[in-house]
């Protein structure tokens, strides 16, 4: 049963940064050996119920030993090492479509527990108020965590010293997406409508473009790093997705869109990086198995418009998709089969394209509810609360920005749970990068970075927030350096 052993390995990988923090080589050897043993045991034919029980017990034991997990990309997750996961995403996995063990005894598809988002806030508060000894949970007395975050106010913490570097290799063509590698301070990638993807290294100085990935015949609309940063997946207006090896830049596989439509966005399934979800111009989302190049059976659904944005919750059981008609759909993701079940629909604003969706399970000490950050062409940045296990959204507040036509994106800051307040960052058509405190009732603006000469389309923090990258519609990528306190 490939699905369960991949979930077990994903749990181990997420805790791997906390094992022997002074011996990163041991952590790497450990996770590789775990991957090997789990793959071997997957062929032993153990009863599915026994495997699921093992997964639950494994998660409970690791949680008791190391404490609650932080959000992916946070400084705690970084923990002195950029090695989080083995290179499992390049292994040949079993296709969910053809795996008879993904079926129950009578041939029915199994579903797994999806958890209750309705109880998520209560659970978070329970962890906060009744945490076990030795666990790492943000509190008002979390001096070490505050020190990691700078022990300063949000305004002071998000003061920037200026530009660290400017990349202009994609000048004259928009750069719709820029992303730091997972748990990495100095590795950056960006994609361009010129049809290429750049991999950049910021240290040692001077920053350099390591390689440019070429192969798409039209603009690259989106890309994503795998959990272990060994591969990237990209989507393009040429109706294909490509799988790239980040180490040498080679194209591992080219996968055509099942509908032969322009591909507009993509995201990895966070628990099983062998699966990638893509959205296209024919209003469809598809779950793709990147090892086989096939669409997963039952992993497709239709929206009301062109699919522009995708985001999973941290456990990988809820997927949100936004389209150019102003709707956001939630889907239940079956971990055992890869099947999508449409759950809820929210009309943000009829006819206003939803260009960005970011999910977060724990925003801050003051905002411990699962949240969704959404950009739509409304001249507003929207923050929603996730209120139940089907992804129902409730508007919490909005922030003024300029966005009426461009595909602007936004992010939650990776260290926000370690300090008083919580910050989000967004691009804007006024050519600025805006910072907002989601907990401040009045005057939520924290900072504004000026330097772009075109609408800012995307922003990305590295894992410790020492650097911020922003890209714009003219092809410029600016890396900003935060002031050291």
Swiss-Prot record:
Q: Which residues carry this modification: Omega-N-methylarginine?
A: 114
Q: Which UniProt keywords apply?
A: Acetylation, Methylation, Nucleus, Phosphoprotein, Repeat, WD repeat
Q: Does the keyword Transferase apply?
A: no
Tissue specificity remark: Widely expressed.
**What GO terms are given for molecular function?**
promoter-specific chromatin binding
Q: Where are the WD repeats?
A: 162-202, 208-246, 250-290, 295-335, 341-389, 394-438, 444-482
Cysteines engaged in disulfide bonds, as pairs: none
Q: Using the record's annotations, give every residue carrying the modification Phosphoserine.
A: 70, 74, 79
| Major location category of this protein | nucleus
What subcellular compartments does it reside in?
A: Nucleus
Biological process (GO) annotations held by this record are: negative regulation of type B pancreatic cell proliferation
User: Coiled-coil intervals in this record?
Assistant: none
Q: Which SUPFAM superfamilies match?
A: WD40 repeat-like (SSF50978)
Name the record gives this protein: WD repeat-containing protein 13
Q: Could you tell me which species this protein originates from?
A: Homo sapiens
């Amino acid at each position: 049963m490939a699905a369960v052993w991949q979930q077990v390995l994903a749990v181990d990988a997420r805790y791997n940064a906390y094992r022997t923090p002074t011996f990163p080589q041991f952590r790497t050897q450990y996770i590789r050996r775990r991957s090997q043993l789990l793959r071997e045991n997957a062929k032993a034919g153990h009863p599915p119920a026994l495997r699921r029980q093992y997964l639950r017990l494994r998660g409970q034991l690791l949680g008791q030993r190391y404490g609650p997990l932080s959000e992916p990309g946070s400084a705690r997750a970084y923990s002195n090492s950029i090695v989080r996961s083995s290179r499992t995403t390049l292994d040949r996995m079993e296709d969910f479509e053809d795996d008879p063990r993904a079926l129950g005894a009578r041939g029915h598809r199994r579903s797994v527990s999806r958890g209750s988002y309705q109880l998520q806030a209560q659970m978070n508060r329970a962890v906060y108020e009744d945490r076990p000894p030795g666990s790492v949970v943000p509190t008002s007395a979390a001096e070490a965590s505050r020190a990691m975050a700078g022990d300063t106010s949000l305004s002071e913490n998000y003061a920037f010293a200026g530009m660290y570097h400017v990349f202009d290799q994609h000048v004259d063509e928009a750069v719709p997406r820029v992303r730091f590698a997972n748990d990495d301070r100095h590795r950056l990638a960006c994609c361009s409508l010129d049809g290429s993807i750049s991999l950049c290294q910021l240290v040692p100085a001077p920053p350099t473009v390591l390689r440019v990935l070429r192969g798409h015949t039209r603009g690259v609309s989106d890309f994503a790093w795998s959990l272990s940063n060994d591969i990237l997946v990209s989507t393009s207006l040429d109706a294909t997705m490509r799988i790239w090896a980040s180490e040498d830049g080679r194209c591992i596989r080219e996968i055509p869109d099942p509908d032969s439509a322009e591909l507009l966005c993509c995201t990895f399934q966070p628990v099983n990086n062998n699966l990638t979800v893509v959205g296209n111009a024919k209003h469809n989302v598809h779950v793709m198995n990147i090892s086989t190049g096939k669409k997963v059976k039952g992993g497709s659904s239709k929206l009301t418009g062109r699919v522009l944005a995708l985001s999973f919750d941290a456990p990988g059981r809820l997927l949100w998709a936004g389209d150019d008609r102003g709707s956001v759909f939630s889907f239940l993701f079956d971990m055992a089969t890869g099947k999508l079940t449409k759950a809820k629909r929210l009309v943000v604003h009829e006819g206003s394209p939803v260009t960005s969706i970011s999910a977060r399970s724990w925003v801050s000490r003051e905002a411990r509810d699962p949240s969704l950050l959404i950009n739509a062409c409304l001249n507003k940045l929207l923050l929603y609360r996730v209120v139940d296990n089907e992804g129902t959204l409730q508007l919490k507040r909005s922030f003024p920005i300029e966005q009426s036509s461009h595909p602007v994106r936004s992010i939650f800051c990776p260290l926000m749970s370690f300090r008083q307040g919580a910050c989000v960052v967004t691009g804007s058509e006024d050519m600025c990068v805006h910072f907002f405190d989601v907990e401040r009732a009045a005057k939520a603006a924290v900072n504004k970075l000026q330097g772009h000469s075109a609408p800012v389309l995307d922003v990305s923090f590295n894992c410790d927030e020492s650097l911020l990258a922003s890209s714009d519609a003219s092809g410029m990528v600016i890396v900003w350096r935060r002031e050291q306190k």
